[in-house]
């Protein structure tokens, strides 16, 4: 028993020393997600072309480094197919060649080397969001939508709304309580918005936060009402979590909330949640909408049967 405890203590000490070294070497690129659960991430970019970027999320098991590898996930929407397999194989080869040793620095530099090679042989990453960490879902139905015309974000539709000036004040961003299930964590963020430029400003501000930027997925949806045109501009983003953006937007439609952006960050913990992940995403969103006065309680909204007679912007206090 004492030997086992000594073994665990030695591993923990090695982990602490390795994390301290990586934090010192990489500075702001290194991010602690959950120190107690030993979850970390690092954002790795090609020096000359920062558009080539990968986020490496790492979970350190108790037996690392002596007898178990780190649990890792590579987050990059553009990295797919053979390229993803090649990079994963390279990381696994490093572990095999250095079994029992601390290898995170070697992994980071291998990824950086991979990005450098990619940048020299390609114009730029394909940012099509097709990478999934879980089994795919189905797009939401389009029933129960408000009886007004709907506009998708485009250069034409954006002109309907008053553009935000460059010196316009950044909308206030609210952060909700996190939900954790099987090592995956979900956290909602909300902001009142009146035009697409404000949406982008809020997203940019959120992504300045290292922890949010390193999330496996940042799913968002927004709805903006234009009274003159009796139209709603709305859009959503899965960020690789297939169908999640559409489901989140559908929730906003059912509640008929307007002039609001909701973002849900998910940090994937290595265990598949199946359909539960959609439940957590929408529960996070609903909770912060209720908290900020955009929606009624769950009991009241369920009585409405998905048909909201009065569109809801934020309620005055």
Swiss-Prot record:
Gene3D superfamilies, A to Z: Impact, N-terminal domain, Ubiquitin Conjugating Enzyme
GO molecular function: protein sequestering activity
Record CDD domains: RWD_IMPACT
Superkingdom of this protein's organism: Eukaryota
Residue ranges annotated for the RWD domain, each copy included: 17-118
One Gene Ontology biological process: cellular response to amino acid starvation
Protein family membership: Belongs to the IMPACT family.
Self-association state and partner proteins as the record states: Interacts with GCN1; prevents the interaction of GCN1 with EIF2AK4/GCN2 and inhibits EIF2AK4/GCN2 kinase activity. Interaction with RPL39; this interaction occurs in a GCN1-independent manner. Associates with ribosomes; this interaction occurs in a GCN1-independent manner. Associates with actin; this interaction occurs in a GCN1-independent manner.
Function per UniProt: Translational regulator that ensures constant high levels of translation upon a variety of stress conditions, such as amino acid starvation, UV-C irradiation, proteasome inhibitor treatment and glucose deprivation. Plays a role as a negative regulator of the EIF2AK4/GCN2 kinase activity; impairs GCN1-mediated EIF2AK4/GCN2 activation, and hence EIF2AK4/GCN2-mediated eIF-2-alpha phosphorylation and subsequent down-regulation of protein synthesis. Plays a role in differentiation of neuronal cells by stimulating neurite outgrowth.
Protein's name according to its UniProt entry: Protein IMPACT
Species annotation: Danio rerio
Lineage: Eukaryota, Metazoa, Chordata, Craniata, Vertebrata
